[in-house]
């Protein structure tokens, strides 16, 4: 946290409800004890933003990142901006996978999710993703989004 100077910022503010942070990741287990007071919305009409399978790799990752952003202060997660609104747009399929598989999404799906999340009001995006294979087309689609 101190490497990126977040501690002084976190001492000054916990964020504001009107600041909407888009989380493009897996679904989120909103019933997690550290997230019960978090302000979480999901993009309507899409695959659910809340987790149906808490043990899926997608849900574990989405919930972990949500905790970093908006868990209750004093919880096990950093809780960088717990008073901001978290807008969840899952991009990872919620399947039970083996330990050597990572959740994935295509560049097209990620680009569409970026656009949808911005159109739904997010002004800050959190993406914990990388291209698995180099792709000029994939990079171009993401740049356009």
Residue ranges and their predicted role:
Residues 1-7:
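Short gly/ser/thr-rich secondary-structure transition/capping motifs
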Residues 48-49:
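Low-complexity, polar/amphipathic intrinsically disordered segments that mediate membrane, lipid-surface
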Residues 136, 140-145:
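Short acidic, glycine/proline-enriched helix-loop-strand junctions
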Residues 7-43, 52-106, 120-123, 134:
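Subtilisin-like serine protease catalytic core
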């Amino acid at each position: 946290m101190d490497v990126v100077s977040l501690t002084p910022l976190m001492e000054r503010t916990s964020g504001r409800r009107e600041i909407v942070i888009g989380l493009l990741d897996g679904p989120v287990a909103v019933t997690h004890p550290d997230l019960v007071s978090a302000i979480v919305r999901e993009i309507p009409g899409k695959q659910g933003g809340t987790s149906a399978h808490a043990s899926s790799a997608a849900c574990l990752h989405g919930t972990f990142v949500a905790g970093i952003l908006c868990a209750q202060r004093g919880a096990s997660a950093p809780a960088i901006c717990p008073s901001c609104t978290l807008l969840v747009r899952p991009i990872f399929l919620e399947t039970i996978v083996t330990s050597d598989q990572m959740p994935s999404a295509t560049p097209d799906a990620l680009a569409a999710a970026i656009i949808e999340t911005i159109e739904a009001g997010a002004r800050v995006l959190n993406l914990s993703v990388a291209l698995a294979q180099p792709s000029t087309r994939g990079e171009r689609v993401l740049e356009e989004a």
